[in-house]
């Protein structure tokens, strides 16, 4: 099993692993054998930072999971939506898949769309955005980012893409803009950087 990465879905976290102040809905999530989502944070050896999601944006809970409890692991790259769907987010996923496949880069849905595809639990609604993760181990020119964003903005719903770099993640929409520095999300927290791929930024 590969080391868990941000946005991976993990199954196997026991209810007993939750702290005493965990809300009842979080206990219900684990009791129902639903997965947790890997989040960015520094953890002690043998642990991974995860998040639990319930119904709606207000039901989110941060926790820690032991690596030995992982029974199954699924990354966004393994998820693909159904060919037909009434949900705009999944319609958008189907419409942009050929473009992203042609890029040659690993990618996949995260957020509500990824969770629904992986679990079969309907968490999307007609106003849901589509969240995507695009692995960019090599720098993506800002002009290329703007071209890709122009294509994605023609989809049936808003699409938010996180570019996963060796240093962390940056929003495609922000990288396609003209600001000199952009917000990089890393295990050490968010910070503004000029180049999300630069080794010196990772060491900062």
From Swiss-Prot:
InterPro entries: Holo-ACP_synthase, MdcG_C, MdcG_N
Swiss-Prot/TrEMBL keywords: Nucleotidyltransferase, Transferase
MF GO annotations: nucleotidyltransferase activity
Top-rank EC class of the record's enzyme: transferase
Active site: 129, 131
Disulphide bond pairs: none
Catalytic activity, as annotated: apo-[malonate decarboxylase ACP] + 2'-(5''-triphospho-alpha-D-ribosyl)-3'-dephospho-CoA = holo-[malonate decarboxylase ACP] + diphosphate
Function as written in the Swiss-Prot or TrEMBL entry: Transfers 2'-(5-triphosphoribosyl)-3'-dephosphocoenzyme-A to the apo-[acyl-carrier-protein] of the malonate decarboxylase to yield holo-[acyl-carrier-protein].
Name this polypeptide is given: Phosphoribosyl-dephospho-CoA transferase
Record gene name: mdcG
């Amino acid at each position: 099993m590969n080391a868990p990465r941000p946005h991976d879905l993990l199954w196997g976290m026991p209810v007993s692993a939750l702290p005493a102040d965990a809300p009842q809905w979080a206990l219900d999530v684990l009791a129902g054998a639903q997965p947790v989502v890997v989040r960015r944070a520094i953890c002690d050896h043998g642990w991974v930072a995860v998040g639990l999601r319930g119904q709606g944006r207000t039901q989110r809970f941060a926790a820690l999971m032991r690596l030995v409890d992982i029974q199954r692991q699924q990354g966004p790259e393994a998820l693909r939506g159904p060919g037909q769907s009434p949900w705009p987010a999944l319609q958008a996923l189907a419409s942009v898949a050929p473009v992203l496949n042609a890029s040659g880069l690993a990618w996949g849905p995260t957020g509500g769309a990824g969770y629904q595809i992986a679990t079969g639990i309907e968490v999307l609604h007609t106003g849901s955005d589509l969240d995507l993760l695009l692995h960019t181990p090599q720098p993506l020119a800002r002009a290329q980012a703007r071209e890709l964003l122009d294509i994605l903005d023609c989809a049936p719903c808003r699409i938010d893409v996180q570019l996963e770099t060796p240093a962390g993640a940056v929003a495609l929409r922000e990288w396609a803009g003209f600001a000199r520095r952009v917000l990089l999300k890393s295990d050490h927290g968010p910070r503004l950087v000029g180049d999300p791929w630069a080794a010196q930024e990772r060491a900062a």
